[in-house]
């Protein structure tokens, strides 16, 4: 990577965790991802979750239809794991190059996860098949028991679900997605080569004070929820260390304005427009720009066993204003950092 004071040139990055939704929302948000990233792991939690090969093929085509001319972008599809999922269907999708990975949502952990897994034991035959195939398991790592505090869900998940699972299936490739705690950072750091993590820009930039002090900021509300500053600092230190099993996953998750700014608002930050520049700012603040390219462009392909992208992206130190909103057909989207200025932007 070359890193003059005003320009960062890196291999074209990938986004290893994104929500593109469907319908008009999909058409609005896809270009923000396809313009910058060569590939993206697309989450399967639509209102009707992606649980079959045919559904994934159809969804992939809807995504490709929304990619503007001139964008070179490959959506990597995932299968939504349910208690009743057929392991043969999953294997067929993997062998046919339709499914890149499978996603484990604990039931009711986040948006459109009511169809999720009630217990790991319920899907053990599927997970055993994935281990044999070398197919990555993507995990939303939170328990959802009513008696567990929302700020403790991730740490409890490590002890009660993640570690027992990895002890049982020792060569299953696992991505601990959007980690938010020092517990998870340490767990991944201490893990072996079969365990990796994605980290979002919001969890590197903010903590729960930013969301709650001086008024509630609904556009910082996401799941897993922002944690204390000690957890934010642990994530920042992990990426700044050059740790190679952590990589870019924005978890960009758009919801229309009226679904965010309401008495019972939805979880998710639509960060696709400013995510790459946000990551760059964090790495710069941590004096870790030497590790920026690996986090964005190299570590993910290495874990997934995929080639690195051939193109390049340049970020320039050119302050840009993030728009207050982005138009939808019948509403608007409020992007991450709306109305603020970002100091690194992607050169067009």
Swiss-Prot record:
It catalyses: (S)-dihydroorotate + H2O = N-carbamoyl-L-aspartate + H(+). InterPro entries: Amidohydro-rel (IPR006680), DHOdimr (IPR004721), Dihydroorotase_CS (IPR002195), Metal_Hydrolase (IPR032466). Keywords: Hydrolase, Metal-binding, Pyrimidine biosynthesis, Zinc. The modification N6-carboxylysine is found at residue 103. GO terms for biological process: 'de novo' pyrimidine nucleobase biosynthetic process; 'de novo' UMP biosynthetic process. Zn(2+) 2 binds at residues 103, 140, 178. It comes from Salmonella newport (strain SL254). PROSITE patterns: DIHYDROOROTASE_1, DIHYDROOROTASE_2. Homodimer. HAMAP family: PyrC_classII. Catalyzes the reversible cyclization of carbamoyl aspartate to dihydroorotate. The keyword Protein biosynthesis does not apply. Substrate binds at residues 19-21, 45, 140, 223, 255, 267. GO terms for cellular component: cytosol. It holds the Pfam family Amidohydro_1. Binds 2 Zn(2+) ions per subunit. Its EC number is 3.5.2.3. GO terms for molecular function: dihydroorotase activity; zinc ion binding. Pathway: Pyrimidine metabolism; UMP biosynthesis via de novo pathway; (S)-dihydroorotate from bicarbonate: step 3/3. Zn(2+) 1 binds at residues 17, 19, 103, 251. This is Dihydroorotase. SUPFAM superfamilies: Metallo-dependent hydrolases. Belongs to the metallo-dependent hydrolases superfamily. DHOase family. Class II DHOase subfamily. Its cofactor is Zn(2+). The active site is at 251. The gene is pyrC.
């Amino acid at each position: 990577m070359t890193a003059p004071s005003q320009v960062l040139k890196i291999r074209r990055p990938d986004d290893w965790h994104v929500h593109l939704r469907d319908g008009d929302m999909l058409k609005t948000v896809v270009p923000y991802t396809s313009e910058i990233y060569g590939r993206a792991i697309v989450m399967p939690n639509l209102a009707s979750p992606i649980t079959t090969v045919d559904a994934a093929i159809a969804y992939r085509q809807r995504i490709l239809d929304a990619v503007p001319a001139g964008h070179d972008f490959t959506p990597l599809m995932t299968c939504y794991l349910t208690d009743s999922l057929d392991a043969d269907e999953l294997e067929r999708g993997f062998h046919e190059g339709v499914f890149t990975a499978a996603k484990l949502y604990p039931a009711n952990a986040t948006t459109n996860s009511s169809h999720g897994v009630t217990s790991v034991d319920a899907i053990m035959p599927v997970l055993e098949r994935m281990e044999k195939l070398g197919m990555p398991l993507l995990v939303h790592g939170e328990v959802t028991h009513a008696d567990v505090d929302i700020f403790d869900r991730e740490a409890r998940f490590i002890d009660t679900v993640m570690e027992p699972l990895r002890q049982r299936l020792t060569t299953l490739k696992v991505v601990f997605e959007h980690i938010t705690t020092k517990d998870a950072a340490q767990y991944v750091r201490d893990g072996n080569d079969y365990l990796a993590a994605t980290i979002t820009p919001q969890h590197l930039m903010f903590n729960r004070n930013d969301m709650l002090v001086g008024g509630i900021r609904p556009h910082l509300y996401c799941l897993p929820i922002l944690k204390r500053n000690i957890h934010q600092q642990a994530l920042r230190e992990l990426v700044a260390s050059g740790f190679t099993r952590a990589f870019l996953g924005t978890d960009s998750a758009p919801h229309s304005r009226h679904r965010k700014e309401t008495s019972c608002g939805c979880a998710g930050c639509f960060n696709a427009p400013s995510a790459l520049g946000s990551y760059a700012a964090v790495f710069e603040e941590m004096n870790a720009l030497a590790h920026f390219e690996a986090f964005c462009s190299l570590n993910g392909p290495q874990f997934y066993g995929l080639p690195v992208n051939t193109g390049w992206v340049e970020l320039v130190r050119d302050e840009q204003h993030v728009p207050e909103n982005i138009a939808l057909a019948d509403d608007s989207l409020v992007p991450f950092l709306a109305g603020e200025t970002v100091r690194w932007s992607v050169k067009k």
